[in-house]
């Protein structure tokens, strides 16, 4: 297996959840993080565009403003979502792998992999290498 390197300060943790409870754990993690660290930014990666939209709706339902970014959104909306997140207007970005490639996001405090990517190891590393 090819050796991969991540950022030295990266703290990686895994929480395996039953699929039917995944969203409840996600909400609890996001709400707790925002309560303890209100200025922290969070990216939630999802496997599909549909799941990304649903998680964005879930965040809105629990009172967490978020930006949603995936390939099915028009470019203008993607640009607007990314700008809102980068400027701090929203502290949560819900995205597919479209956000793990080549975007310049200077400070992300928490990356949550809502659904494990198809090529797990490589995708997770790309998502964490800002």
Residue ranges and their predicted role:
Residues 1-130:
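Conserved helicase RecA-like core
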């Amino acid at each position: 297996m090819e050796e991969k390197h991540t950022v030295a300060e990266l703290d990686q943790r895994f929480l395996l959840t039953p699929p039917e409870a995944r969203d409840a754990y996600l909400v609890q993690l996001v709400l707790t993080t925002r309560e303890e660290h209100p200025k922290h930014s969070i990216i939630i990666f999802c496997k599909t565009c549909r799941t990304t939209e649903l998680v964005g709706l879930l965040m809105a339902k629990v009172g967490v403003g978020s930006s949603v970014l995936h390939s099915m959104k028009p470019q203008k909306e993607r640009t607007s979502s990314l700008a809102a997140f980068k400027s701090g207007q929203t502290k949560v970005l819900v995205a597919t792998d479209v956000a793990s490639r080549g975007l310049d996001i200077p400070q992300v405090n928490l990356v949550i992999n809502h659904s494990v990517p198809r090529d797990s190891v490589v995708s997770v590393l790309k998502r964490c290498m800002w």
